[in-house]
Amino acid sequence: MLSIQNLHAGVDGKEILKGINLEVKAGEVHAIMGPNGAGKSTLSSVVAGNENFEVTKGDILLNGESLLEDAPEERAHKGIFMSFQYPVEIPGISVTNFIKTAINESRKAQGLPEMPAAELLKKIREKAALLEINPNFLSRSLNQGFSGGEKKRNEIFQMAMLEPKVAILDETDSGLDIDALRIVANGVNKLKSSDNAVIVITHYQRLLDYIVPDYVHVLHDGKIVKSGTKELALELEQKGYDWLK
């Protein structure tokens, strides 16, 4: 599904990613861990198409098709979703209107007509119920006045509505108390299927108690230095990252 091949990328002439290779298949959950400054958020930004970063070598393929020439919105239309560590506030635009616009822009890019209002409303209600989201939440301005947990739940709701092929969750556990973390993780688990894949980027093992990965990769100094299963995350929790240098 997603194939990252010998990816080198950086910003302002400084190389940050130094040859990343990663194969993510449909139905899989991959966790990417590593110390601060390892390149985790850079990797997610580069896959999503952040234009502040320059790819100098390698490729990113989605279902065999290179994404490198695609703008961020084109990658989103093709099925790449990224939840941000610090979601932006958009006063005056409700959660529902934002979702409506995002879905219809994606459909337009695929040559499809706008989703009928009744169908959209039905889908919103179904996904909100699935994720235990209060309907009043959907009429609020996007992220304005939201708590950390509400912002993250909103992003998982967007993921539910957009149904991406690959969802990249960047530090989704950042700033969440244990109850909010559990709610967000349960939402992600409910959205997993054999048709999509999830990449979880995290500094801490605790998120992986709730979103259990098939594979764990350790990023250090712009390279994947070790890969394994859930047990690797537990080992990192006990030993830290220094033993991998």
What do the predicted segments below correspond to?
Residues 2-4, 17-19:
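Conserved structural motif at the start of ABC-family nucleotide-binding domains
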Residues 33-35:
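The feature captures the beta-strand-to-loop junction immediately N-terminal to the Walker
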Residues 59-75, 143:
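ABC ATPase NBD Q-loop/coupling interface
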Residues 82, 86, 92-108, 123:
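Q-loop/switch helix immediately C-terminal to the Walker
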Residues 159-160:
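ABC ATPase C-loop
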Residues 168-172, 179:
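Walker B catalytic motif
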Residues 215, 219, 223-245:
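Conserved beta-strand-loop-alpha-helix hinge in the C-terminal portion
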